[in-house]
């Protein structure tokens, strides 16, 4: 639905613009690549292709727990800005370059009866939203 709305809005805007407006220079967009990390007890992944305009030289984006796969602190970074969220109380957000990204939590029990906590951050992007998540065994 979001993509359909964006396409309709883009078509409406293009009909409203005169041909001279199409000749105007637009800022190029840079592919932002979400780094994937794997390790015992947690995984970090991205969902969807995303293009985000960047004003710095960074072309990478990292989302990770602390070393040792400790989910008490999550780290978000685009190479220039970094923020850490203490998630022990399950109520903190991540802020990157003045933008706040809420952290969502889920607790589940896997097939082996182990309790797992998953922290997820949704990042709205120009094309598709990016969902980053990390999970660890609850202690």
Residue ranges and their predicted role:
Residues 1-7:
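Bacterial N-terminal signal peptides that target proteins for export
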Residues 10-18:
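Bacterial N-terminal signal peptides
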Residues 17-30:
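Sec-dependent signal peptide cleavage junction
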Residues 28-38, 134, 139:
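A short, amphipathic beta-strand motif
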Residues 39-49, 79:
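Small-residue (G/S/T/A) turn/hinge positions that recur once per unit in extracellular repeat modules
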Residues 50-55:
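Short, solvent-exposed loop/linker segments at the N-terminal edge
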Residues 58-113:
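Surface-exposed interfaces of beta-sheet-rich extracellular modules
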Residues 102-138:
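Extracellular interaction modules
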